[in-house]
Amino acid sequence: MMKKLISLLLSAVLAVSLLACGASAKTLSASTLRIAGLKGPTTMGLVNLLAMEKNGTAALDYDLQLYGAADEIVPKLIKGELDMAAIPANLAATLYQKTNGGIQVLAVNTLGVLYVVETGNTVHSFADLKGRTILSTGKGTTPEYVLRYLLKKNGLDPDKDVKIEYYSEASEVTAQMAATKKDAIAVLPQPYVTAAQMKDSSLRVVLDLTKEWNKVCDTQLITGVTVVRTAYAEDHPDVVQAFLTDYEKSVKAANTDIDGTAALCEQVGVVAKAAIAKKALPQCNIVYRRGEEMKKDISAYLQVLYDASPAAVGGKLPDDNFYWVKPTTTQQVQHKVKKLFQ
């Protein structure tokens, strides 16, 4: 009798879910999606969500929160004060291990955006970095591990041949460069490279770390990914899917509507001036990669980091559950049955 009842319930819920296919996620979940990003390229792909919400074309309501450093986002994500976040790829892997699968990756959002810059004219190759001090942001995340990996690949010991000074935010690095003035060397991401060059015309890009990565590695250099709390994804698979639809449109707008996106970047606080974003956006490698392509790119990138330093990805490589895919019909039905009994 119980099996028959459950079967009837599942059938009923499936029918309801099929009828609701055309409904918006706003109908399915009244809560606002809380998503965080860093002041940089990973958030530049998110800002058009706000424009979409304002003009009524977004499937969801968004609370986009901006932070200067990844370590400000992590505790909020763990505590459930955020639903999603755009964070460095290796940090996502580390959090997955630390939270026992508490987060999942939804998409790759940014490829390589890192550059070595200097205010002098002394660096023309990695060999010229020997004995020098390098200013950088991102300790424990993409900038640190990419820089160390490339230094080693170019015959330099990052612990002996150079001195790396880390700062919490890229804006602190640019401020320190300005204070040092002569022959300062730094690793900076876009749009901070552009912002710094607009203030100081003597600043020059000496190494494009994406190009340098491609010389020694056959995997994609991935700067950022978008993650979701696993519990949230399990409770709201329909909302996650609706977000991804909106997000894909937002990324497309970031790459096609440069003026509009630049204005939003200033409005949100990603950059100080829209002019900076307008000049930097074409160099920010903002992407939307999902599914098998996402999994292939991330897993290959994490393998490179793991081989160089297991600590970079949390001690071990994440399993397949690290990657969120579109929920099956059964999962959607189970979700709706769960809601019926709450």
Which positions does each model-derived feature cover?
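Short, low-complexity disordered leader/linker segments with a strong preference
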Residues: 1-32, 331-342
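Short, glycine-/small- and polar/acidic-enriched structural segments
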Residues: 26-161, 165-166, 190, 206
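A bilobed periplasmic-binding-protein/Venus flytrap-type ligand-binding module shared by bacterial periplasmic
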Residues: 48-50, 114-125, 220-239, 287-290
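Short, solvent-exposed loop/beta-turn-alpha elements that line the ligand-binding surface or hinge
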Residues: 53-60, 211-219, 286-295
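Pocket-lining segment of extracytoplasmic ligand-binding domains
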Residues: 90-91, 172-264
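Periplasmic-binding protein-like
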Residues: 108-118, 204-232, 282-283, 320-321, ...
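Secondary-structure end/capping motifs
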Residues: 233-312
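Conserved C-terminal helix/tail region of periplasmic/extracytoplasmic solute-binding proteins
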Residues: 299, 303-342
